[in-house]
Amino acid sequence: GLIYRGNKIVNWDPKGQTTISDDEIVYEERASKLYTFKYSKDFPISISTSRPETKIGDVAVAVHPEDPRYKNYIGKSYAVKDFCGIELSVKIIADKEVDPEFGTGALGVTPAHSIIDWEMADRHNLPRPQVINEFAKMTVGENNILGKKTTEAREIIVEWLRSEGLLEKEEDIKQNVSTAERTGGIIEPLPKLQWFINVNKPIKERGDKTLKDLMREPFEKKEIKIIPDYFSKTYFHWLENLRDWCISRQIWYGHQIPVWYDKKDQIFCDIKAPEGNNWKRDEDTLDTWFSSGLW
């Protein structure tokens, strides 16, 4: 089947307390800051980020494999004894997804709080420590950070970097911030155990075509025409970048997912409940767009 349950990065709305789809995100241009700093005085590479609060969850620094500035560091690991009260182990990795022109050309990798970093972790077999919870609050750190909202933790960490002489640059930038269409809450990328539809899996009954292939086919065969025509580029760009669709939601309205679990984590899927009292139904509901598509 195409539907599976997996622990993956989702778009989490801390205000609505639910996952949302990529198409329910509204990007708002906001004033922000880009910070350039080192994890410690003896760390060899400076990184740039607009979210210093996530850096306590860093496990690697990624550089472009052809960037001559960092070639001698690739493959090495460094122990950071104290990054604002947190001990880090940071490995230097080479990844073609890194833009050598952005910031210092070195990217702090926080797999649990960025879809790009999560995919890097897949490619490089990196750990995924989570440092932010569903309420957009910090889950690790000393008392000055633990339990603080991400915006508060950001200020605390920046001040710590400044006091330690690690902050090298602070720039004003404009940034597209992901917000939830319904609540206006700022989206927090989080790893969650959810239900997904695989858009890249070959479907035997459809000639081993994927869902992406089937979504592309009627346009290539001229069976469907996009008007005006220039939106075709938008559609195909969206299709090429389409990731597996998260179809589970933490909302009270909608079709409840027809899945039950027992104490041994066995899964039963049917429209009717299984026999016996040792089964608990999945508390999530289906994305309303998925539900409407069933009709």
What are these regions (language model features)?
Residues 71-75, 144-158, 163:
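A glycine-biased structural micro-motif
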Residues 80-81, 199-205:
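Short regulatory "switch" loops immediately downstream of catalytic or recognition motifs
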Residues 2-135, 214-248, 289-290:
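NTP-handling and nucleic-acid-processing catalytic cores
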Residues 2-54, 149-153, 158, 169-201, ...:
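Active-site neighborhoods of enzyme catalytic cores
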Residues 184, 204-216:
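A preference for well-ordered globular domain cores
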Residues 122, 162, 181:
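Anion (oxyanion) recognition and catalysis
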